[in-house]
């Protein structure tokens, strides 16, 4: 029982760390990356579809991404979705591909992105702490129902605290890495 609760909490905490990593991937650093387009959905014949399913991406230079749609008919919708996103780029359409040129990051913009990264890291830490609280409530319920003893619950809570620290430290490490990436000129 206790191991099941701890195992489930650990798995969910891993997912929270991974979700934070994906959020950080969408934050633009100095180099343009296809992962920046992960959150963009395109209206494809009436169905919201992730952009990765509709096109391939290449990056010939550090600040340029070329998007080649599999279906040329979706070009206008892809262009509109990119323009409406928060990426801050205006794609140029040559009929077969979309070319997105990202401007150099200013110091002010870098600091803005660092604030966004810190907010996303805090969201990740809050998610991990909420998972800890839920798991702790389950453990206390087991003790209250008389299914396990107080010593078992105390030991499990210590293990749970260790898992929580491990996952929040992982999020902090991701944040430090993203900050250094953003400050790199």
Predicted regions and their residues:
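A positional/architectural concept
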Residues: 1-76
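Glycine-rich active-site/cofactor-binding loop and its immediate structural neighborhood
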Residues: 62-92, 96-98
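Positively charged, low-complexity, intrinsically disordered RNA-binding extensions
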Residues: 98-185
